Every structure is written in C-alpha cells, then in structure tokens.
Curated annotation (Swiss-Prot):
The keyword Protein transport applies. Involved in a type II secretion system (T2SS, formerly general secretion pathway, GSP) for the export of proteins. Required for secretion of cholera toxin through the outer membrane. It holds the Pfam family T2SSC. One of its GO terms (cellular component) is plasma membrane. It comes from Vibrio cholerae serotype O1 (strain ATCC 39315 / El Tor Inaba N16961). InterPro entries: PDZ_sf, T2SS_GspC_N, T2SS_protein-GspC. It is found in: Cell inner membrane. Residues 1-29 are cytoplasmic. It is a single-pass membrane protein. This is Type II secretion system protein C. The chain crosses the membrane at residues 30-50.
C-alpha cells in the first residue's frame, strides 16, 4: 500500500477554494429540492386542517333501550321494616311499691327534736319541723333529715315516723312523752242544722272548747285548720287550707276549703323557711291573723284563743 504525502499547510487555502467552486452547484440543487419538498408538505397540511374544520362531526349519544324516562323513587320501607339493628323499646320505670307505715314504731335514739307538725289529709303534703344539733328545718314526706341518713316517712298529730336505715322509728312532739300510737283523725261529725233543737248552743260550745284547747297548746290549731304546702317550679306559693278533724272552728272563723294562706301573723308563708320561725313563736301566741287568697282577692281571718 502506498501512502501519498499530504500537501504542505500553505497549499490548503488554494485547494479549498478550488473544491468549493466544484461542489457549489450540486449543493445548491440539493438545498432547492429540499425546500420544495418542505413547502409542499406544509401546504398540504394547511389544506387538510381547513377542510377538517368545515366538515361537521356528528355528536355521539348512547342508545337508550328498555329504560324509562322517569326515575322511580327508592322504596326503603322494606329496609325500615327489616329491623336490621333490632327493635327499640322504651325502658319502663319500675312501679314504686310503698311500704306500710309502722305506727307503733319504737322511739328513735337519734338526737332530734320535733318542734312542730302540719298534718294533712294528703300525706304527701304533710310537713314537720325537726331540729338537729340546734338547726331547725322543715321537711316533707321522704325528705332526708339534714345531718342523718333518716328520712321523714309519716306525720301524725303528736309524732312523726322516720325511716332510719330501713327501720321505722317514732319521734314525739317536743314536750310529749312516748305513749301509745297516735290514732287516726276522727271523722267529721255531722254539722248542726238550724232547725234542730239546741243546735246553735252546741255549735258555740264546741267552738269554745276548741279555742280553750288551742289556748293551752297553740299548735293544736293545725289539728282543726290544716295547711298543705303548694309549690310551682320549686317555689312556694303558699299553703292550701282545709278543715281538720272537726270543721266547726274552720267554719266559725269564715275560712273556706281551698283558700290559699299567704301570710300568718305578718310572716310571709311563701318563704320556705318560715315554718321554723312560726313554730318557735307558737307557744307565745294569743291570737292569729291569717291572710288568705280567694278568687284572686286577699281576705284577713282573725282567730282569738
């Protein structure tokens, strides 16, 4: 193999000039052909785009077969009746069984003092003023006596029955000794009629006898004029008055069954703690001024012992 010697470096410019003139024509023809092809391709693409925009393309829509135009509401009654999670049953309160009151209960050993009682024909409206360690308070049926675990169970004219740890016990009225059980209230005697002989004298004699009994023990007034506390929304409205074991005094002073007592000797009976003050001053009373509401009007009733 023979190797030709390359021309010297100084001869390169001359050689390049000769070769350029020789290749100029083929290069120009190739570039011209390439430009023509590119122009034709661009023109064809523009024509295709314009024709495609003018031709409308139909919009596709699904074919509905066997379907109703109106939507039917979903029936969930079957699910509701299925009781998937069970049947809700509202819990029923267990009936309250009231235990009978033991009227001959033994005397209590608790250091309590019964200062006064307001016995009512409706046992739930009876009240008792009980002092424990020098502190007096008024209690209703089933209320727990402050400072103890005992609760008031029944109120009688001369005593109360308390339930202490499930055991009935008797608390006597202050100043009275424990005796035989208190008897039930005597039924109301027949009212005297004006056409009966000696009816008026008997009525007046009975009233005088009751006044004398009250003068000896002013708390006896509550055996002939019963007071029942009336509340609304935990607020004391007063005390409903009703005749006691003998209605002669009740009628003689002008009271009517259902009157609402709102004041007694100037004491506001709507005060929840007024009974404490009332029973403390009972033994010093010689007369009683009772303010009652009747048919929306107030009336003052005076009782002299």
């Amino acid at each position: 193999m023979e190797f030709k010697q390359l021309p010297p470096l100084a001869a390169w410019p001359r050689l390049l000039s000769q070769n350029t003139l020789r290749w100029q024509k083929p290069i120009s023809e190739g570039l011209t052909l390439l430009l023509l092809v590119a122009s034709a391709w661009t023109l064809g693409k523009m024509v295709w785009v314009v024709s495609a925009e003018q031709t409308p393309v139909p919009t596709w829509s699904p074919t509905l077969s066997g379907l109703k135009a109106e939507r039917q509401p979903l029936d969930i009654s079957v699910l509701q009746k299925g009781e998937l999670f069970g049947v809700f049953t509202e819990p029923k309160e267990a009936p309250v069984v009231e235990q009978p009151v033991v009227v001959d209960a033994p005397k209590t050993r608790l250091s309590l003092v019964l200062s006064g009682v307001v016995a009512s024909n409706d046992a739930q409206k009876s009240l008792a003023v009980i002092a424990n360690r020098g502190v007096q308070a008024t209690y209703g049926i089933n209320e727990v006596i402050e400072g103890t675990q005992a609760k008031l169970k029944a109120v009688m004219p001369d005593r109360v029955i308390i339930s202490n740890s499930g055991r009935d016990e008797t608390l006597m009225l202050e100043g009275l000794d424990y005796t035989a059980p208190a008897t039930a209230s005597v039924s109301n005697p027949p009212r005297p009629r004006p056409n009966q002989p000696n009816a008026v004298p008997q009525f007046e004699d009975k009233v005088d006898a009751i006044r004398e009994a009250i003068a000896r023990n002013p708390q006896e007034i509550f055996q002939y004029v019963r007071l029942s506390q009336v509340k609304r929304d935990d607020k004391v409205l007063g005390y409903r008055v009703s005749p006691g074991k003998d209605p002669v005094l009740f009628e003689s002073i002008g009271l009517q069954d259902g009157d609402m007592a709102v004041a007694l000797n100037g004491l506001d009976l709507t005060d929840p703690n007024v009974m404490n003050t009332l029973f403390q001053s009972m033994n010093e009373m010689t007369e009683m001024s009772l303010t009652v509401e009747r048919d929306g009007q107030q009336h003052d009733v005076y009782i002299q012992f």
